[in-house]
Amino acid sequence: MDKIFEQLDGLLDRYEELQELMSDPEVISDTKRYLALSKEEGGMRDVVAAYKKYKQVLSDIKESEEVLRESKDDDMEALAKEDLEDLQKQKADLEDQIKVLMLPKDPNDDKNIIMEIRGAAGGDEASLFAGDLLNMYMHYAERQGWKTEIIDATPTEVGGYKEVVVMITGDNVYSKLKYENGAHRVQRVPVTESAGRVHTSTATVGVMPEYDEVDLKIDPKDIRTDVYRSSGAGGQHVNKTSSAVRMTHIPSGIVVSMQDERSQQENRARAMQILRSRVYDYYETQNQEKYDQNRKNAIGTGDRSERIRTYNYPQNRVTDHRIGLTLNKLDRIMNGELDEIIDALIVHDQAQKMESLNV
């Protein structure tokens, strides 16, 4: 904990400095600066509170140890021992809490997300499972008090999706759903299977933080926009006007097509929304090869052997292969009860980060 204490003392000094700055009338009148300082202060608040409590516990431990050394009263000594035992437990708990709070923060954790779900290996059954995953995430979002909106979809004749893109907005969406990146495998008897045999299919999930113009400004000269006639929903209207939009970010080669909205203006806005997130994702890697690999890891090739989680319907079982977690409540999970899986993934991620920091 010594290295952490060095950081904590500096953090405490900075926190107190921020408190002073935020009460300065000159700073208060500068909205942009005040908001920036407020955000910094908010990011420190929990760890500073835990550290102050920790310092108080250390002081109480020292006091109890002095009582034990100097006491000649058996009752007083017994009481001090009891207090000391309780304080040592508090100290250990606070050390664990502080370690977690001091882990590097993902700057995207508080962002909304754009989620892409694709039916992959398994034909019609894979497209149906893509629809099931969409429903699962939408139910989970509802439980979290988040909002969902389907912004692009390619439905299949059997009622599933070849691809569907959904935007999920709310508090800390990315922090919880970023672990859903990868290939999801389903084992079940398809509705079209007369012999009752279990088939294996795959759907892939990609999760990107939603970025806005503050995060990334794209030069309009770097975007080529093509318009064409939509073949999607919207009745005869779509055949009379070129409302569909295809945007290409020339430096990266990233392409986004959008035709689900009724007007070209709406399709442009939606396409730009997705394009900005993909381009930011690209520049985060600063390397086309890394970008391609990340997209492959996120969206997946759809191969049956590539998976992060398996959903076994006959046995009502879900297994997350990354952490070896198996839960026999598939029916509840598909209804949006994902908390147990996501919480376990967060704990696993934190443990790995702690190990890498050797704290």
Swiss-Prot record:
Q: Which HAMAP family match?
A: Rel_fac_1 (MF_00093)
Q: Which residues carry this modification: N5-methylglutamine?
A: Q236
Question: Can you tell which superkingdom this protein's organism belongs to?
Answer: Bacteria
Q: What is this protein called?
A: Peptide chain release factor 1
Instruction: Keyword check for Zinc, yes or no.
Output: no
Fill in the PTM field for this protein: Methylated by PrmC. Methylation increases the termination efficiency of RF1.
Concerning Pfam families, the annotation shows: PCRF, RF-1
Role played: Peptide chain release factor 1 directs the termination of translation in response to the peptide chain termination codons UAG and UAA.
* UniProt family annotation: Belongs to the prokaryotic/mitochondrial release factor family.
Keyword Phosphoprotein on entry: no
Which is one Gene Ontology cellular component term of this protein? cytoplasm
Keywords, A to Z? Cytoplasm, Methylation, Protein biosynthesis
Database matches in SMART domains: PCRF (SM00937)
Q: Name one GO molecular function term.
A: translation release factor activity, codon specific
From the Swiss-Prot or TrEMBL record, state where the protein is found.
Answer: Cytoplasm
